[in-house]
Amino acid sequence: MNAMLPVNALPLEIILQKLVKAGANMTSDTRALQAGDVMMAYPVGNQRQCTDNRLFIADALSKGASVVLYEPAGLSAELQAICLDQRCVPVKDLANQAGVIASHWYGEPSQTMRVIGVTGTNGKTSVAQWVAQALNQKNQPSAMIGTLGAGLLDHVVPTGFTTPDAPQLQSLLGRIKNQGATSVAMEVSSHALDQGRIHGTHLD
């Protein structure tokens, strides 16, 4: 008889199906985490300036995260001990995979909407607004994601980011799709490109 494999030895998709309830969110911010959600923990930035939310894995577990996906590279001994919890699942190169994982979790919303990315040094906000308004006038229910917030044009909610991080972006795209949008005009900052925030997003 074969010994039972530990949960984190199973393929990621099976782990999520087994441990996470439908409707749960994925987030990299413990402040937004609700019991049952999935936490994504990975460092972002470079040697000069780096934000590492793996420091909040214990907080995520105490808040009732169903699963914590974490980047195993460079993990301190203290965090390695915390990650012995069966809910913690290592994912190599998570910063670049987070968007793809979250997109799959939310039903790949960008595959069934027209998503237009706007990048550049200046003018992203204005251009994204104009594009969304023009599509709206062509009877294509449109939304925008950017500096002013995210949502359908008549209900834009602040997010605090020009381009939200990968899990939040996929969550927003899923919500916008469920609200009836068929098109999205999205600001794409240089930081977003550098940090892989739009990975998993199909751009037209």
Labelled PLM ranges:
Residues 1-100:
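N-terminal leader/targeting and accessory segments in enzymes
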Residues 97-204:
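Phosphate-binding loop of NTP-binding sites
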